[in-house]
A protein has these predicted regions:
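A membrane-interface helix-boundary motif in multi-pass transporters
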Residues: 8-35, 231-251
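Intracellular juxtamembrane helix-capping segments at the cytosolic ends
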Residues: 189-203
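Juxtamembrane intracellular "pre-TM" segments in multi-pass secondary transporters
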Residues: 51-86
Length: 269
């Protein structure tokens, strides 16, 4: 509902600021997105049954939430591999969230030389492929374990970004589409299996607490990644390909951190 309200506000503001046909296409896409958010939220309201909680207990926990982040980080150290996994997740979420924050679209136009329309089409293709990737990685995670699948996905991400740099440096246009396919497949994949990984490392009675840390790490990475990209591109003037390679370094750091974490659960969840 909140997302739909925000999209509606954006839609109204676009009506006010659109004096030519230049933004008509974007305006129509926002209208479609607004409707889809509402449509796909309906099953959650109709078919997902929530457990009833004692309001007094919930309110007490809410007041304690001011201290929960630091407390949870300290608590996570008591469980083997959990803190290390979260640190590793910060590095790969930093790289991936930097791309999906909108900087990839800029890269495709400014460095790869795609038109705005071609860029949108490639990103749309990547989104469709990500759905397939999520399903495939989910099945693979059940068979091979989330650790192996996470590491494999990180390796694919590194290859994907290196291919993007090669494509733009040597003007091999078709390679950028390979990047889109690999990246799309693995963005769906890594966010499918890393949740399973997280669950295996966390005791059932503290899942909510530690998933709060999981989310906090992702949000913090969303802030830090674009700042790093902007610093490399705009302050150091080293170019977008250097910024892209810096993301490869982040993924590599993440790979070696997570490689040392076992996905064998010590809990019966």
């Amino acid at each position: 509902i909140g997302s739909s309200v925000l999209l509606k506000i954006a839609e109204i503001n676009l009506v006010k600021t659109t004096y030519s046909g230049a933004l008509v296409k974007s305006f129509e896409l926002i209208k479609i997105s607004n409707g889809l958010f509402l449509l796909f939220s309906v099953p959650a309201f109709l078919f997902i049954e929530e457990k009833k909680f004692n309001i007094d207990k919930v309110s007490v926990k809410f007041r304690e939430s001011l201290y929960i982040v630091v407390k949870s980080w300290r608590h996570s150290r008591e469980y083997k591999g959990l803190t290390r996994f979260l640190i590793g997740r910060f590095f790969y979420a930093d790289a991936i969230n930097t791309l999906i924050s909108g900087l990839l679209a800029v890269y495709l136009v400014e460095e790869a030389g795609l038109t705005a329309e071609d860029s949108q089409n490639l990103l749309a293709l990547a989104i469709i492929i990500s759905i397939i990737g999520g399903y495939v990685y989910g099945k693979a995670g059940d068979k091979y374990g989330p650790r192996k699948c996470t590491l494999f996905s990180l390796g694919c991400w590194m290859v994907s970004l290196i291919i993007a740099v090669i494509s733009t440096e040597f003007d091999i246009d078709w390679l950028i589409y390979v990047t889109g396919v690999i990246g799309g497949f693995n963005i769906g994949g890594i966010f499918a299996v890393d949740r399973v990984f997280m669950t295996r490392l966390s005791p059932k009675e503290h899942l909510g607490e530690f998933y709060g840390l999981y989310s906090t790490v992702g949000r913090f990475a969303t802030i830090v990644g674009p700042i790093l990209w902007g610093f490399i591109v705009n302050t150091l003037n080293l170019g977008r390909n250097t910024a892209m390679l810096s993301l490869v370094v982040l993924l590599m750091i993440s790979f070696f951190i997570i490689r040392g974490v076992s996905d064998e659960s010590n809990f019966v969840n």
